[in-house]
């Protein structure tokens, strides 16, 4: 759908970031009520927002801190990650997603937009979601990273993950998605 068609509002409501006015949601065949993003995370959902700088990265934190923050929130304050778990998780996703960074302790704000987006993807993949919502994940990034993200989406879907991929680019949707819905 085009900008302004309600795509982001719809997925934000599904994820619990915004309140839904009406409707029902089923996860694994069971009707659920999602009031907060934490509710969605506990149901196996992950959401990469449209606006990387305003809603995605936490600019003053390191690459490591940005990667582990969602898993730590999902586990809760009474089950903190150890320093080794944090370092191992960050290193795993830096390598897996080929994030170009001097170290895991580099401030995320010093990375390119494409590498920031990969850090956010790593954050959500670390939570081991069943359902990944990607709102304009390739907007404003270089063509190489765009291709890497599209390939990752196809690989995740091949591995059985449900992925909702929102894009304004019809060509990208045709290349990346097995099914499409158009909002007007």
Model-derived features: where do they sit?
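Glycine-rich phosphate-binding loops of nucleotide-dependent enzymes
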Residues: 1-184
